[in-house]
């Protein structure tokens, strides 16, 4: 052996000497020079660490029965609510009885429960946030629409804003006193009487006008220059046949006999000038020419007008050439 050991190099550390039972260096109670601790030392250290962890987690253990312990109990209302949000509902299986937890398991499960607590709280807040902003006050609006209005307010609105309110049956219309037929009849009688009086008062004013026109017509029929039954064509033909400057005649107007009942026709230089005669103030005055003149002369009758221009020149304006000429009424003509 010595030769073999001397010839080959020894690998690894030197072997320990053989163990002797009687040797004091190998007794169990003697300290061992080995680097590995004894089994008892590991147990002691584990117990110390457990005690330290238990001491560190003691404050959460006191608050555990108040808020977190009911969240993990099966069969409670909170547990069913939590399961409703976490996953689909299914047939609940009876859970086996839980064994009595040791100090180590309680210490280990405390952080898990502490972590699950805020999750449960956040889910409750999420559920509450989904429930609170739900339908935006539809029941209040429906209730407001179904509520009957105050009769005083409804009556005031219907009396003051009838144009804006839609036509329809108003609530409690019996409050509004309906007018009787007697005032309406009296008002109708008053209106009829007023209209009759107005017609009676207007009749005298019309009668003088009619009588004045009748008297005027009777006076005109006796005049040598009035052509009562002739139209424009007949009058112009008669004047052109005469061929005298200053020949004239008065005829009824071709249009409706309103404010221009007559027309004065005058011949000058081979042309016939037709000038309207206007009636003013209900037949009390007459004017020659169309409206809008700056200066016009008023006459009491058509005969007074013809007599005036028999001695005063009458200005005549040609519409085509714009030339202006003067002439007097010299030759009365009657077709």
Swiss-Prot record:
Record field: compositional bias (Pro residues): 91-100
Region named Disordered: 1-139, 166-215
Protein keywords: SH2 domain
One GO cellular component term: cytoplasm
GO biological process, one term: cell surface receptor protein tyrosine kinase signaling pathway
Pfam families to which the protein is assigned, alphabetical: SH2
Chain ranges of the SH2 domain: 225-333
Composition bias type Polar residues, residue spans: 202-212
Keyword Transferase attached: no
Gene3D superfamilies listed in its UniProt record: SH2 domain
Comp. bias (Low complexity): 1-10, 63-74
Taxonomic superkingdom: Eukaryota
CDD domains: SH2_BLNK_SLP-76 (cd09929)
Name of the protein in question: SH2 domain-containing protein 6
